[in-house]
Amino acid sequence: QAQTRTKEHSESERCDTKLKTMNILEKIIIDKKREVELKKSIIPVSQLEASVLFNSRTYSMSKLLKNSFSGIIAEHKRRSPSKAIINNNHSVEDVVLGYQNAGVCGISVLTDAKYFGGSLDDLLLAKASVNIPLLRKEFIVDEYQILEAKAYGADVILLIAAVLTRKEIKQLSEFAHSLGLEVLLEVHNLEELETAIMPSLDMIGVNNRNLKSFEVSLDYSKELASKIPDE
């Protein structure tokens, strides 16, 4: 019994050490995969597909961006790992209506709860308040999350190149298109761009924040701007 406890203690220490050496992005993805599996066990796909919004029409963010003077995608974010609470005591409706009245092309809604304080309810409230494209900003690792996005009123999903393989990006983006959703791919460097670019993507965005360290530099956008194709 003493040997068993010692072995269990050693394994626990190894797990703790591994967690301590992980960057924030790796921790988020581990938590996200667990979260998705839990949700799958609680809410079946059939329930998502039965949503009133599941078969509703979607708005094209890519078309609006091409014909816009501002080219702005605004964001609804409650907090983040780098800045803690940003604005936690506001009305989702007021924020998104303000964005729409300001002439933005679309709104990105954070739905991650643990690290960003968001929820799918925020997306639902936004959908009920505006008639411009909504992007579900989430760490998507599974088709189930794309079904959720459709059921809660998203028009666009975000795929993050840093956490997905090329095969996964292709699979997830094609699945999103099958549901009538557009796809915005987020890249951070040239390697991610060259690896992930493919016909099933509608838009590509450059994140100036390194998701592994959360450091920010505008040099990333400057470097990649000329390398992203127009079509």
Please give the residue ranges for each predicted region.
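Short hydrophobic alpha-helical segments of the AMP-binding
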Residues: 149, 176, 228
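Short, intrinsically disordered, charge-balanced linker/junction segments flanking boundaries
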Residues: 20, 228-231
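C-terminal helical cap(s) of enzyme catalytic domains, especially alpha/beta-barrels
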Residues: 223-227
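Glycine-rich phosphate-binding active-site loops on the catalytic face of alpha/beta enzymes
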Residues: 148-168, 206-213
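Solvent-exposed, charged amphipathic helical/linker segments at domain boundaries
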Residues: 164-180
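Conserved N-terminal beta1-alpha1 strand-loop-helix module at the mouth
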Residues: 19-134, 141-144, 175-203, 212-221
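Low-complexity, intrinsically disordered or signal/transmembrane-proximal segments
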Residues: 1-3, 9
